[in-house]
């Protein structure tokens, strides 16, 4: 589904272990210990997945990406209806350039400093949605990073029809599928 943002918007990222499921490996199997410091990368079989929550409409989006950088963040936030969009983030450095852009009003919380909520600024909805997405992916016991979108689309649909009455849920499913 296309991302359409009214605002204000929460955005957060999480990383999923997703490799080359169903294809030949070009290296030895990875060890179970933490081998590298830092965040995951698409090339390192731990692609970033962005969670966006539009507080204005209640819509939630889960979008896998090749990289977690400023360009990706700008691309995700580009489909907005208003000129200036309020964005709630955590302290991840890819969101820092939004402070200098007049198209965005950024408010952030720094988890590293023990700050999780500051007035309306929090990303708790994104984090809870990311937790549900991880639970959704876990029974698949390994996901191909190239097909991560295909695994997350049914999750988004399921969350969209959650607690809707039968007919309304069925109409939503038909609209999404067609």
Task: Tell me what each language-model feature is.
Residues 1-178:
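Residue-level recognition of single "structural anchor" positions
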């Amino acid at each position: 589904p296309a991302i359409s943002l009214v605002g204000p918007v929460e955005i957060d990222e999480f990383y999923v272990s997703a490799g080359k499921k169903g294809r030949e490996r070009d290296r030895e199997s990875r060890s179970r210990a933490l081998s590298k410091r830092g965040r995951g990368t698409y090339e390192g079989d731990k692609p970033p997945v962005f969670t966006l929550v539009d507080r204005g409409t209640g819509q939630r989006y889960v979008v896998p990406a090749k990289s977690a950088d400023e360009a990706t963040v700008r691309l995700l936030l580009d489909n907005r209806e208003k000129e200036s969009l309020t964005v709630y983030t955590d302290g991840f450095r890819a969101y820092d350039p939004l402070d200098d852009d007049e198209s965005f009003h950024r408010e952030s919380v720094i988890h590293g400093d023990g700050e999780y909520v500051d007035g309306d600024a929090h990303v708790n909805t994104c984090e809870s949605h990311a937790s549900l997405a991880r639970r959704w992916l876990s029974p698949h016991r390994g996901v191909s990073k190239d097909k991560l979108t295909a695994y997350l689309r049914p999750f988004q649909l399921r969350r969209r029809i959650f607690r809707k009455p039968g007919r309304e849920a069925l109409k939503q499913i038909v609209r999404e599928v067609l």
